């Protein structure tokens, strides 16, 4: 490569490094807010899931309709955050289909749709976009829950797959159960709550669905921002390594050019003598 080519590459990498450093700073600010909001949001999820655990609610084996919700966002540059959710969804779909279940999927975020739509377009019930641009609110979760309830697909049980935040450098792809109102009512252990009015239980079940979606959105957002922060930090470090190597190559090439020119000058002077 010529000195001009190396200079052009150096300039390009330095510009990219400026972008990755800026993106890391933005992700760090968003991560700090997401982590701060995650702790109170976890109460929504753990409280709602506690009912299913304590009542030991399980989907009946003879029921076939299953729903899988995948949580991602509209933005990338955050490692394997979205592909890990898609992989888990594919594994679940394959297992459930093999067991004779009817499976429909819901994509929260454009990324999950772009990964799965080509191969599973016939199984998409609904998808949601404009996710991840702003911190998710309970209102966003309520809109998604309402859309699912009004979709006309009367699933018996299902699951929501998302990335659960563990630390600033780690997350885990998690799966939590969701159930239809009819499945909850039919559960054996629900008989201990016989004094609960059916309308009250249905309202609570709908509220539960919104709670679990809100909880998963908050977990996913925090995981995404921490992963993006890490990815941009790694990209900046890799850019620094490339800049160092190219600078060394540039200096060696320049030295070789200067040496060659000196030899030519000396040879020319010797020829004149």
Swiss-Prot record:
The modification N6-succinyllysine is found at residues 24, 90, 129, 245. GO terms for biological process: cellular response to nitric oxide; proton motive force-driven ATP synthesis; proton motive force-driven mitochondrial ATP synthesis. Its main location: mitochondrion. It comes from the Eukaryota. It is a peripheral membrane protein. The modification Phosphoserine is found at residue 121. Keywords: Acetylation, ATP synthesis, CF(1), Hydrogen ion transport, Ion transport, Membrane, Mitochondrion, Mitochondrion inner membrane, Phosphoprotein, Transport. InterPro entries: ATP_synth_F1_ATPase_gsu (IPR035968), ATP_synth_F1_gsu (IPR000131), ATP_synth_F1_gsu_CS (IPR023632). It is found in: Mitochondrion inner membrane. GO terms for molecular function: proton-transporting ATP synthase activity, rotational mechanism. GO terms for cellular component: mitochondrial inner membrane; proton-transporting ATP synthase complex. The modification N6-acetyllysine is found at residues 14, 30, 90, 113, 129, 172. Belongs to the ATPase gamma chain family. Component of the ATP synthase complex composed at least of ATP5F1A/subunit alpha, ATP5F1B/subunit beta, ATP5MC1/subunit c (homooctomer), MT-ATP6/subunit a, MT-ATP8/subunit 8, ATP5ME/subunit e, ATP5MF/subunit f, ATP5MG/subunit g, ATP5MK/subunit k, ATP5MJ/subunit j, ATP5F1C/subunit gamma, ATP5F1D/subunit delta, ATP5F1E/subunit epsilon, ATP5PF/subunit F6, ATP5PB/subunit b, ATP5PD/subunit d, ATP5PO/subunit OSCP. Subunit gamma, of the mitochondrial membrane ATP synthase complex (F(1)F(0) ATP synthase or Complex V) that produces ATP from ADP in the presence of a proton gradient across the membrane which is generated by electron transport complexes of the respiratory chain. ATP synthase complex consist of a soluble F(1) head domain - the catalytic core - and a membrane F(1) domain - the membrane proton channel. These two domains are linked by a central stalk rotating inside the F(1) region and a stationary peripheral stalk. This is ATP synthase F(1) complex subunit gamma, mitochondrial.
